Amino acid sequence: MAAKIFCLLMLLGLSASAATATIFPQCSQAPIASLLPPYLSPAVSSVCENPILQPYRIQQAIAAGILPLSPLFLQQSSALLQQLPLVHLLAQNIRAQQLQQLVLANVAAYSQQQQFLPFNQLAALNSAAYLQQQQLLPFSQLTAAYPQQFLPFNQLAALNSAAYLQQQQLLPFSQLAVVSPAAFLTQQQLLPFYLHAVPNAGTLLQLQQLLPFNQLALTNPAAFYQQPIIGGALF
């Protein structure tokens, strides 16, 4: 009897629960979290949500986070594209400054090269004249050091270029200019008197060759001026 009563109560309970139950299929879109009390936290609601809908919710959350950033990303890309010409111009300015610094560092060498440019052109046009000019370069430096003492020879070059060139050709062979510049300058100061006394260019060249060996001209110029010139030699 007691067993029958217990079975009857169980059947009544099952029927009552079946009448009040709500069935949700696995493919339903209605979340279980909507049936939960509102005082539960969002974390508990997300845990109680249908597992099939969780990837969809995650995708919606990612899309909701990306969409506000899309206009900002587009604006930044547009700003970068607009700044590309400025970056290119800045690179050109940096390159120009580097080249300017390089030119300033080598301005001394550049100036020296520009000074020697006429000599390079002379070497290309007339190599013989260029070699002769190179041989006379030490005497040109001596002329720059003593301009007043070499003034008569500059006048000679303006009046008679042929005699001046003959005189300059003999200068590299004069060891006196290398050994004793003072004696060489004394010898050159006596040269205008020979130009007045000797009309013959050949005799003048011989005098130039013998002049470094004439000690009288170096020791006593006054007596040397009074000494006569006989033929092509001077003793």
UniProtKB/Swiss-Prot annotation:
Residues 1-21 form the signal peptide. It comes from the Eukaryota. Keywords: Repeat, Seed storage protein, Signal, Storage protein. GO terms for molecular function: nutrient reservoir activity. InterPro entries: Zein, Zein-alpha. Pfam families: Zein. Zeins are major seed storage proteins. Belongs to the zein family. The alpha zeins of 19 kDa and 22 kDa account for 70% of the total zein fraction. They are encoded by a large multigene family. Structurally, 22K and 19K zeins are composed of nine adjacent, topologically antiparallel helices clustered within a distorted cylinder. This is Zein-alpha PMS1. It comes from Zea mays.
